[in-house]
């Protein structure tokens, strides 16, 4: 997929004569093999996790929008690619939410192909891209199940109908609305609305892969986290409530006092005896309300876990743990730990080299990025030749001498010069997926 995507993009940058030399094929081979043997992807591919499959869906969706872009001027049925993309996004939700982050890039490619460029249009397209991502992630995914759950509780508890009757009726209503929208849009010759409704429909069809969870949970498997046996309990699973809440834009710090507690949403479970849904946890006084004087903008140091508090001290030289951390200290933790240690270090593992495969916590001899150039590595990490043999000869050690990084930067500048629109779309993909 990466090979064909790169070739399509490269073909747009070079002349017809250059295409005949096969230079775009060479670029695609280098691109795809670089990714294949990159540290992050290789690690994802050999561990029992969801990230390799998630990367596959991300690559497949991006390849599909490139195919749409190539077909749209000559094929009147090219919108099938947009519907295919919606279906893939729905399917990918059942693997990992990470695949949704390709949506902004898709919106920008659509904008650049369908509309004449203007500054205002460009800004609006970027805003629409983020809003569409938020719409799918925050509204369609959770609220579809939330509404199904509310229907289920109302029809079972209030109307004394059998279990699942509310869910079935909700799906009947949803399907009826979709059919009506498709018929009306075709009757009134509105192809864009028709395509949008079809895309939404196929997004839901892909999303229905979550039914597998309900089926397996009803089989009472040994691992049955949150027990999502019906629409009512599935919402808790989808909202990842077991992970808690992390303040991103505004919120408390690790030492902020709790002033009061608010009530959360009650948890309903099936009761086979009464044939109703009963409250197993009313979640009264379950949401802490923090002292407003102890909250702030962009709180990075908010966890009360003592191990995390120790990390805050280590990465920011925080001395007084009783006072509210300053915004400067928050930014220091953000840049030193979250950006440098948790992002840039991983980035350089792929583009410069990796010291070893030992878990690193900021020390000089474990898990850092290296380049292979001693005068650079020794400035950052000290003499590498004096490390013990089990670290010097570690099988996870790689040195690329910045070659992947240099190739990437050359490609970035060349691409930006030749086709800034495509460059921005691909940058959004890179930025959102990290």
Give, region by region, the residue ranges found by the protein language model.
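Transmembrane-helix motifs of polytopic, lipid-linked glycan transferases
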Residues: 1-17, 59-64, 406-413
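Transmembrane-helix signature of polytopic, membrane-embedded enzymes
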Residues: 2-37, 74-76, 420-430
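Membrane-interface transmembrane helices that cradle and orient dolichyl/undecaprenyl
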Residues: 10, 14-22, 61-81, 110-119
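Membrane-interface alpha helices of multi-pass inner-membrane proteins
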Residues: 31-33, 81-95
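Short acidic/glycine- and proline-prone juxtamembrane loop motifs at membrane-interface regions
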Residues: 40-51
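Perimembrane helix-loop-helix junctions
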Residues: 69-70, 102-167, 171-196
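Transmembrane alpha-helix segments characteristic
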Residues: 198-207, 400-410, 419-434
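Lumenal/periplasmic acceptor-binding loop at the mouth of the active site in multi-pass
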Residues: 217-413
């Amino acid at each position: 997929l990466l090979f064909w995507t790169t070739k399509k993009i490269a073909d747009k940058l070079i002349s017809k004569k250059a295409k005949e030399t096969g230079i775009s094929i060479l670029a695609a081979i280098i691109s795809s093999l670089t990714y294949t043997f990159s540290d992050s992807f290789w690690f994802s591919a050999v561990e029992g996790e969801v990230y390799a499959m998630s990367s596959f869906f991300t690559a497949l969706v991006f390849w599909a929008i490139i195919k749409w872009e190539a077909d749209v001027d000559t094929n009147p049925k090219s919108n099938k690619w947009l519907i295919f993309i919606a279906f893939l996004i729905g399917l990918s939700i059942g693997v990992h939410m990470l695949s949704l982050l390709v949506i902004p890039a898709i919106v920008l490619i659509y904008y650049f192909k369908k509309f004449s460029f203007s500054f205002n249009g460009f800004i609006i397209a970027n805003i629409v891209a983020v809003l569409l991502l938020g719409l799918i992630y925050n509204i369609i995914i959770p609220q579809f199940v939330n509404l199904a759950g509310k229907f289920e509780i109302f029809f079972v508890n209030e109307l004394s109908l059998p279990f699942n009757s509310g869910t079935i009726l909700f799906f009947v209503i949803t399907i009826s609305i979709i059919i009506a929208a498709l018929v009306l849009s075709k009757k009134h010759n509105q192809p864009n609305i028709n395509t949008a409704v079809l895309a939404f429909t196929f997004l839901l069809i892909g999303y229905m892969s979550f039914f597998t969870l309900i089926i397996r949970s009803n089989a009472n498997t040994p691992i049955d986290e949150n027990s999502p046996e019906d629409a009512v309990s599935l919402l808790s699973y989808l909202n990842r409530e077991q992970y808690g809440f992390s303040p991103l834009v505004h919120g408390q710090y690790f030492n902020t006092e709790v002033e009061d507690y608010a009530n959360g949403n009650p948890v309903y479970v099936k009761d086979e005896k009464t044939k109703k849904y009963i409250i197993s946890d009313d979640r009264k006084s379950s949401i802490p309300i923090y002292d407003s004087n102890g909250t702030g903008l962009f709180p990075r140091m908010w966890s009360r876990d003592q191990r995390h508090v120790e990390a805050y001290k280590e990465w920011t030289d925080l001395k007084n743990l009783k006072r509210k951390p300053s915004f400067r200290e928050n930014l220091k933790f953000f840049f030193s730990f979250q950006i440098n240690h948790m992002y840039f270090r991983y980035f350089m593992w792929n583009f410069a080299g990796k010291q070893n495969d030992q878990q690193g916590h900021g020390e000089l001899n474990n898990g850092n990025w290296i380049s292979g150039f001693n005068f650079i590595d020794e400035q950052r990490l000290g003499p590498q030749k004096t490390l013990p043999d089990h670290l010097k000869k570690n099988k996870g050690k790689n040195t690329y001498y910045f070659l992947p990084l240099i190739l990437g930067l050359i490609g970035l500048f060349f691409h930006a010069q030749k086709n800034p629109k495509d460059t921005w779309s691909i940058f959004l993909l890179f930025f959102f997926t990290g």
